[in-house]
């Protein structure tokens, strides 16, 4: 870095120097002052600045090396979420993992275990803290089938386990109204029926909307996931009332049903 230094020099007149030998010196005007400016390099300052630059460069290299060694995954922060660069990925607190006898699934974290047993072979039941109509069950029964496909199509399979949907309690004469057939007070509509293969295992998935004449909850959405493994028929049934289905329960019912799998 360059700096400017200024010095004052007294300039003596030549005539004054020549007359110094005279016995009588004439009064001379004051010598004019000459301002001289010189540009000089300040070597120590430059070296100090160079040291600062070197330290900054070294710090940059260290930060870059730390970033490469941290192995931060871009997936740690989803779109619209705050990045969690220096911590572990955030876990999903909406569900709790559950491992049972030969099966596993994710259970909504705000659902509690229930001792109620609705179906033969039922080994697990959880329900919503605030509404028991929102619940899930796991049923395991022996079977001579080798694959879920041996039951026929997903619709045919459902007809063989229709007890899962509930039986109508009233059997009498009724008029045809409200979309129900004569003498019928309950109905079931298949909304979706699919087959899939996961890790070499065949699964059936059926989504059903059941309604009763009393209009309770406007009906129930019942999701059934089923498969066969080691001579056993595994069924996971998750459901929610129609009103709560559209108020947020759908996410948890679908999440639980789709997470079900066998070992």
Curated annotation (Swiss-Prot):
<dbReference type="GO" id="GO:0005509">
    <property type="term" value="F:calcium ion binding"/>
</dbReference>
<comment type="similarity">
    <text>Belongs to the PsbP family.</text>
</comment>
<dbReference type="InterPro" id="IPR016123">
    <property type="entry name" value="Mog1/PsbP_a/b/a-sand"/>
</dbReference>
<keyword id="KW-0934">Plastid</keyword>
<keyword id="KW-0604">Photosystem II</keyword>
<dbReference type="Pfam" id="PF01789">
    <property type="entry name" value="PsbP"/>
</dbReference>
<dbReference type="GO" id="GO:0015979">
    <property type="term" value="P:photosynthesis"/>
</dbReference>
<keyword id="KW-0150">Chloroplast</keyword>
<keyword id="KW-0602">Photosynthesis</keyword>
<dbReference type="GO" id="GO:0009535">
    <property type="term" value="C:chloroplast thylakoid membrane"/>
</dbReference>
<keyword id="KW-0793">Thylakoid</keyword>
<dbReference type="GO" id="GO:0019898">
    <property type="term" value="C:extrinsic component of membrane"/>
</dbReference>
<keyword id="KW-0809">Transit peptide</keyword>
<comment type="function">
    <text>May be involved in the regulation of photosystem II.</text>
</comment>
<protein>
    <recommendedName>
        <fullName>Oxygen-evolving enhancer protein 2, chloroplastic</fullName>
    </recommendedName>
</protein>
<dbReference type="InterPro" id="IPR002683">
    <property type="entry name" value="PsbP_C"/>
</dbReference>
<dbReference type="GO" id="GO:0009654">
    <property type="term" value="C:photosystem II oxygen evolving complex"/>
</dbReference>
<feature type="transit peptide" description="Chloroplast">
    <location>
        <begin position="1"/>
        <end position="77"/>
    </location>
</feature>
<keyword id="KW-0472">Membrane</keyword>
């Amino acid at each position: 870095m360059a700096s400017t230094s200024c010095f004052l020099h007294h300039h003596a007149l030549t005539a004054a120097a020549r007359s110094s030998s005279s016995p009588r010196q004439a009064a001379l005007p004051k010598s004019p002052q000459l301002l001289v400016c010189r540009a000089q390099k300040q070597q120590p300052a430059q070296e100090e600045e160079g040291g600062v630059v070197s330290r900054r460069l070294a710090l940059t290299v260290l930060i870059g090396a730390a970033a490469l060694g941290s192995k931060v995954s871009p997936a740690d922060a989803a779109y619209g979420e705050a990045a969690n660069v220096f911590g572990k990925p955030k876990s999903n607190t909406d569900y709790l993992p559950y491992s049972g006898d030969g099966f596993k699934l994710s259970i909504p974290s705000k659902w509690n275990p229930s001792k109620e047993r609705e179906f033969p072979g039922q080994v697990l039941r959880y329900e919503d803290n605030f509404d028991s109509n929102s619940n899930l069950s796991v049923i395991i029964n022996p079977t001579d089938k080798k694959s879920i496909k041996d039951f026929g199509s997903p619709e045919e399979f459902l007809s063989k386990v229709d007890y899962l949907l509930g039986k109508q309690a009233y059997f009498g004469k009724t008029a045809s109204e409200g979309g129900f057939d004569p003498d019928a007070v309950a109905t079931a509509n298949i909304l979706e029926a699919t087959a899939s293969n996961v890790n070499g295992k065949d699964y059936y998935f059926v989504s059903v909307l059941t309604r009763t004449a009393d209009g309770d909850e406007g009906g129930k959405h019942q999701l059934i996931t089923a498969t066969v493994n080691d001579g056993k028929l595994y069924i996971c049934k998750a459901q929610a009332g129609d009103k709560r289905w559209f108020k947020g329960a759908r996410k948890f019912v679908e999440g639980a049903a789709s997470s079900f799998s066998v070992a």
